[in-house]
């Protein structure tokens, strides 16, 4: 900036062009929920942190959702004992596991849950488990690669 031939207008133009190119290369982040309150809260939080973002948050039930792109990364934060009664959680998590296995093969699934017992009912083996806290609630973030068939078939 203290260079003899410094051109401030050119510098600003280069910065703006660079920022445009960076934003064009950003992945699209899609969020879905079937509770309007969660959609509004998500949009508000995202816009507060990233005003010029590439996020699309819409109303849709996970069980009606098809992969929007080939081999996506899927991040789930299913309800844990807050929106669903405890006795129904195990069945709900089994349904999540079935949907992941049959609809999302080729994807990488990450699931954040505070219901550690129900998480076992997904029926798919995680390759990574990370202990986190969602506020005061102890949670696990598990990574489950999804593929067709069984793990034995994958490595034959």
Enumerate the predicted regions with their spans.
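Conserved S-adenosyl-L-methionine
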Residues: 1-67, 82
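C-terminal catalytic and target-recognition region of SAM-dependent MTase-like enzymes
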Residues: 61-64, 68-156
């Amino acid at each position: 900036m203290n260079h003899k031939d410094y051109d401030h207008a050119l510098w600003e133009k280069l910065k703006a062009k660079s920022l445009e190119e960076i934003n064009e290369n950003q992945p699209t982040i899609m969020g879905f929920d079937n509770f309007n309150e969660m959609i509004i809260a998500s949009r508000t939080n995202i816009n507060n942190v990233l005003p010029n973002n590439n996020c699309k948050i819409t109303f849709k039930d996970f069980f009606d959702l098809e992969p929007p792109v080939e081999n996506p990364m899927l991040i789930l934060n299913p309800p844990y004992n807050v929106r669903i009664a405890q006795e129904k959680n195990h069945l709900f998590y089994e349904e999540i596991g079935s949907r992941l296995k049959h609809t999302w093969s080729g994807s990488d699934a990450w699931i954040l849950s505070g219901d550690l017992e129900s998480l076992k009912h997904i029926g798919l083996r995680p390759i990574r488990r990370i202990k986190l806290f969602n506020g005061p609630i102890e949670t696990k973030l598990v990574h489950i690669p999804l593929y067709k068939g069984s793990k034995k078939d994958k490595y034959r």
